[in-house]
Amino acid sequence: MDFALDSEHQLFRERFRAFANDVVAPRAAEIDRTGEFPWDVINAAAELGLLGVPIPEEYGGVGADGLAFTLLIEELAGACGSTALTIAAHTGLVCVPLLMFGNEEQKRRYLTPLAEGKMLGAFGLTEPQAGSDAGATRTTAVRDGNEFVINGQKVFTTNGSIAGVIIVTAVTDPEAGRRGISNIIVPADAPGVSFGQDQEKMGLHGSVTSQVYFQDCRVPVDNLLGRPGEGFRQFLQVLDGGRIGIGAMSVGIAQAALRAARDYALEREQFGQRIADFQAISFMLADMATQLEAARWLVYRAAWLKDRGLPHTTEAAMAKLFASEAAERICHKAIQIHGGYGYTTEYPVERYYR
């Protein structure tokens, strides 16, 4: 049992951290304040291959494994959660399923430009009445000759209105229940695709969250991902990886909050000493560090299992659950350690909390 990252993953982490510190972090506060989408940051990431880290080189990616991708999302999230979410959704929810289930023509036509960062991808799963109950999908795709005619609505679609392609879950066989759901590749500029106003959120302001509408949208039947009726099984597998990604985001944000709280506690003086020297503060920092390490290794283990083709559904869910809740607790304590300043935008901890 070896808990150390090997030299290859250490090198990946160093490169990802350098990019996050040099390119992403300087823009993070402005992105959060204005809500603008950071195309400059995303394009810079694409130039370094960071939009296709776990995708083989033959399809425009880096050819690294899932753990390397986890390290990327962790480092990006510590600098800017919006940037991390954008890339996590693009790669994990669009590139990866195309790699797993797409045929060769689909990989060449869609996966390669996505992995190269020539366009962004989105995954249209959630609907107004089908959130956690994804099997309740009402969007339909009716075959008409050599085309599918798609009608329906998707909500909470990350990257939706800025994507070049959307993988859409739709009912292709109404009589088959969950086995009648299929995944279909839909170009975002296809006739019949439209977008509502992007949703305003409490945090992650630089991440685009869209409502997507399909009205008699026609796409070739060749855009079916895998076989008819495999959509539910496919997105269950994909969401396992997505949960690891959310866990990695949580770890990255929590790490940034802990670092900020530690640094502030070492600088701030009250009653003639650093506040870090007060036992109440040191206990808080100790709890934060312990929860962070526990979360990190749950996430890494889930990624490790996935890379080896071992069952990881439960482990991915555990990692997401614990890491996300640990991040909330850590960020909350970071604000408390900052006192009144923690509530202001002068310090980054309020952004980490959101």
Stretches with model-predicted labels:
Residues 64-65, 133-135, 159-164, 177-180, ...:
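Short glycine/proline-enriched turns and hinge-like loops at secondary-structure junctions
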Residues 117-125:
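A short, Trp-centered hydrophobic/proline-enriched beta-strand micro-motif
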Residues 129-140:
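Active-site-adjacent elements of ketosynthase-type condensing enzymes
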Residues 147, 151-195:
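A short core secondary-structure module
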Residues 81, 131, 155-161, 204, ...:
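Glycine-rich phosphate/pyrophosphate-binding beta-alpha loops
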Residues 1-89, 101-106, 113, 117, ...:
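Alpha-helical interface subdomain recognition
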